[in-house]
């Protein structure tokens, strides 16, 4: 089982979108499915996964950007945002964020 590591940014933002229960469901799902998100081209291995929010329906989902460090047994949650707010974060920004957090590629 992989360990979840939250970036300071993710830790600050997730409460804007999820209940504690939503957060727990996601934290239980991702370690078992680390490659579930779409690979973001040019990002150095970052992935984007779509996830729902309680009571928000199909259109009220969020996007979570993360990187899987399979060799070290961890998944790093980089950021979270509402669907439609930031459709695409530039790959070079994601790559830089992952590098700063010690992503191993």
Segments from the language model and where they lie:
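Residues that recognize and position ribonucleotide moieties
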Residues: 3, 47, 87
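Arg/Lys-rich, positively charged N-terminal/basic patches that mediate binding to nucleic acids
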Residues: 1-21
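Sequence/structural signature of beta-propeller domains
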Residues: 20-25, 32, 45, 50, ...
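Enriched for short, Lys/Arg-rich terminal
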Residues: 68-105
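Basic/aromatic recognition patch in beta-strand/loop cores that engages polyanionic ligands
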Residues: 40-79
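Amphipathic alpha-helical interface surfaces
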Residues: 6, 22, 26, 58-61, ...
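Small/polar-rich, solvent-exposed N-terminal microdomains that initiate assembly or binding
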Residues: 30-41
């Amino acid at each position: 089982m992989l360990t979840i590591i939250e970036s300071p940014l993710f830790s600050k933002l997730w409460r804007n979108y999820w209940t504690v229960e939503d957060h727990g469901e996601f934290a239980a799902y991702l370690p078992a499915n680390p490659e579930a998100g779409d690979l973001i081209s040019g990002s150095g291995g970052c992935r984007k996964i779509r996830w729902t929010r309680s009571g928000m329906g199909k259109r009220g989902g969020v996007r979570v950007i993360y990187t899987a460090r399979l060799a070290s047994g961890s998944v790093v949650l980089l950021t979270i945002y509402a669907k439609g707010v930031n459709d695409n974060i530039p790959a070079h920004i994601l790559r830089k964020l992952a590098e700063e957090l010690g992503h191993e590629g």
